[in-house]
A protein has these predicted regions:
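A short, surface-exposed alpha-helical micro-motif characterized by mixed small hydrophobic
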Residues: 211-213, 484-486
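Conserved ABC ATPase signature
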Residues: 143-148, 152, 412, 417-421, ...
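ABC ATPase NBD Q-loop/coupling interface
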Residues: 61-79, 117, 188, 279, ...
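A short, proline-enriched helix->beta-strand linker immediately N-terminal to the Walker B motif
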Residues: 163-167, 436-440
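Conserved ABC ATPase "signature" region
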Residues: 120-139, 390-412, 522
Length: 526
């Protein structure tokens, strides 16, 4: 008998059906990956096994250890959740309660599902955190979620999920919010803990590289329908369904032209420091200094892409903000030969030369502004001489350049708001906003990490085409080695605020001299 068996599961919200007659099974100790893009129904399917989907109508059968989950009473469901089946959510910062210490949140689960209380429950919680590799465990257990790094928060959530030794662990995109090296550590940790406890794992993901390495079987979902399932090697190496084939073939393809001569960005001995609060009574009277970037030098040529890689906290995003003139820095940074140490008026003119595309377009685009207002905002600042007709013409051309519309068909889009577009379309709007002022340099801060794999490929192809068309230079900040391979001419590796090594793409990714770089590359292809 299977540990979990789902038969003809359908889920609907009112008249809208989001999962349609899905069937699969999972044996004790087995690893099954549910794969699909956003809105494929994979998360709804997995969370339905615990009846965690509110205001939904569920039909079909869900059996756990032979018991009908859809017929369980509330007290039976309470025992099932956390004790027999546990969940790790995608973003630990939103899943953990910000007003309670991490250890207290783990204690709550232990006291709910076991007979341990007080000091015994606390000791068990600290032990669970120690087992998942959190160092300085007693202090971390008394810390609040915001005081931990992303990797530590995810480990704390894993500790909470595994504290009561569940038979099944549901991991919903458990590493999407983490950088490559931490992602590999967390996945290897999950695999070790799963093997030790003989636990089954239901992995929800859109990352086929992850599936290749960690799943025994894979089930592919598209628009609420399970289109294909089977052993991992069979499904990925010989996909039968067109949708599975599209997912497998969505890996970015390298398509870059040669860079030009000269320099559009020059950085010399760049140093960025933050004030930090000192511990104890000293913190009342003085502050310390934290160095986020130390002694960084680099150049960027016209039409060139420089990939900056490194773990969270390595200083790569801080360096990008300094280059953008958004953070005070020591040393020398020149954009097109001009320094940021100029008057406010000259600084405004310089900002036209360098623009940025952020990681998550939903949070970087104002929900109160229309597409026309979002894209045209830069023109109001940098080209105030344009009349309304000319400004709209430039906006329409920008939409056409990023592939959101055919010529002459932009009018219906201009009055719409960001929430009315898909994730990929929103990122195209963000790119159009950056390009509307005709910059020489664009900083790309994790430009595809919030997108599905097929949309990632489309956006990367768009960026490559725009680079060839306009001679753009890119500073690409990312932890995705596949994206670096597809876009970068040169790579710079950062660790603990410093450059570990830099050079041509092949030199760094294939013939690296640094153990740290090799670890990043290995994690990126995991």
């Amino acid at each position: 008998m299977s540990l979990l068996e789902v038969r003809d599961l359908s889920v609907s919200f009112g008249a809208r059906q989001v999962v349609d007659k899905v069937s699969f099974s999972l044996d004790a100790g087995e690893k099954l990956a549910l794969v699909g893009e956003s809105a494929s129904g994979k998360t709804v399917t997995a969370l339905s096994t615990l009846r965690l989907i509110e205001n939904a109508r569920l039909t079909g059968e869900i059996l756990f250890n032979g018991k009908q989950v859809l017929k369980m009473l509330p007290e039976e469901l309470c025992e099932l959740r956390g004790r027999d089946i546990a969940v790790i959510f995608q973003e630990p910062m939103t899943a953990l309660n910000p007003i309670y210490a991490v250890g207290d949140q783990i204690v709550e689960s232990i006291e709910l599902h076991t007979k341990l209380r007080g000091a015994q429950a606390w000791a068990e919680a600290v032990g669970a955190m120690r087992r998942v590799g959190i160092d300085d465990t007693e202090r971390r257990a008394r810390s609040y979620p915001h005081q931990l790094s992303g990797g530590q928060r995810q480990r704390a959530m894993i500790a909470m999920a595994l504290a009561c030794n569940p038979k099944l662990l549901i991991a919903d995109e458990p590493t999407t919010a983490l950088d490559a090296a931490i992602r590999l550590q967390v996945l290897e940790l999950l695999e070790d803990l799963r093997a030790q406890a003989g636990m089954a794992l239901l992995l929800i993901t859109h990352d086929l590289n992850l599936v290749r390495r960690f799943a025994d079987r894979v089930a592919v979902m598209e628009r609420g329908v399970m289109v294909e399932q089977g052993p991992t090697a069979q499904v990925i190496e010989h996909p039968r369904h067109p949708y599975t084939q599209k997912l497998v073939n969505s890996r970015p393809v390298r398509d870059v032209g040669p860079p030009g001569a000269g320099r559009v960005v020059e950085a010399r001995d760049v140093r960025v420091e933050y004030p930090t609060r000192l511990p104890g009574i000293r913190g009342w009277f003085m502050s310390g200094r934290f160095t986020a970037v130390e002694g960084v030098d680099f150049d960027l040529a016209p039409g060139e892409t420089l990939g900056i890689i490194g773990e969270s906290g390595s200083g790569k995003t801080t360096l990008a903000l300094a280059v953008l003139g958004l953070m005070e820095a020591q040393g020398e940074i020149r954009i097109g030969g001009s320094s940021w140490r100029v008057s406010a008026k000259e600084k405004r003119m310089l900002r036209r030369e360098i623009q940025v595309v952020f990681q998550d377009p939903l949070s970087s685009l104002s929900p109160r502004l229309t597409v026309e207002a979002i894209i045209g905002e830069g023109l109001e600042i940098h080209a105030p001489e344009l009349n309304a007709a000319d400004r709209r013409k430039r906006i329409v051309q920008a939409l056409y350049d990023v592939g959101l519309t055919e010529a002459g068909e932009a009018e219906p889009l201009l009055a719409r708001y960001p929430h009315e577009f898909s994730g990929g379309q929103r990122q195209r709007i963000a790119i159009a906003r950056a390009l509307i002022v005709k910059p020489k340099v664009v900083v790309l801060d994790e430009p595809t990490s919030a997108l599905d794999v097929t949309i990632q490929k489309q956006v990367l192809e768009l960026l490559a085409g725009l680079q060839r068309k306009y001679g753009l230079s890119y500073i690409l900040v990312t932890h995705d080695i596949d994206v670096v391979r597809a876009m970068a001419h040169r790579v710079m590796v950062m660790k603990d605020s410093r450059i570990v090594e830099s050079g041509a793409l092949e030199q760094i990714l294939v013939n690296s001299r640094s153990d740290y770089t090799r670890k990043l590359v290995e994690a990126g292809v995991a």
